[in-house]
Each structure stands twice: as C-alpha cells, then as structure tokens.
Amino acid sequence: QKPGEAVILEQSIDNDGLGQYTFGFKTSDGLIRQEQGVVKNQGTENEALEVRGTITWLGADGKDYSINFVADENGFQPQYTQ
C-alpha cells in the first residue's frame, strides 16, 4: 500500500433481486459507507428507487464527519453531521 492509498477492509453486498439491496464497506483510511435501497410503488407509474445511507470519514483534524442521505424521486437530500 502506497502512502495516500486506501484498501478495503470490509465489504458487504446483498441484493434480493426483487427491488431491495444493502451494501457497505470500510477502508483503511477510516471511510465507512452503508446504504440501503428499495423500489417504492413497484410496478406502477410512480415506481421510484429510494436510497438511504451514511458516509463517515476521518478528517485531517482527527474528527469523524458524517453525511446521512436520502435519494429518491425528490432528489438527493444530504444531512451533514459532525
């Protein structure tokens, strides 16, 4: 591993093939991502993918930072936390 390069320490992926999935990973530089998706109103004209998740990382100041988000028919809606 070269300086500044991260490696994946953990990874999980589960897709039920019916419109739901989860995935996540953790890297050696402290990045963590978790995400869940589901197809809402499946089979209708209002069908839409809804994704919810969290991204957490270690800042240069040593503090953890996070973004919780929803992405759906209303767009990407992030909420930043520290």
From Swiss-Prot:
Record GO terms (molecular function): structural constituent of chitin-based larval cuticle
Domain called Chitin-binding type R&R: residue spans: 18-82
The entry's keywords: Cuticle, Pyrrolidone carboxylic acid
UniProt cross-references to InterPro entries, sorted A to Z: CHIT_BIND_RR_consensus (IPR031311), Cuticle_Struct_Prot (IPR050468), Insect_cuticle (IPR000618)
GO cellular component: chitin-based extracellular matrix
Pyrrolidone carboxylic acid modification, residue list: 1
Coiled coil location: none
Superkingdom classification of source: Eukaryota
Function comment: Component of the abdominal endocuticle.
Protein name: Endocuticle structural protein SgAbd-6
Organism for this UniProt entry: Schistocerca gregaria (Desert locust)
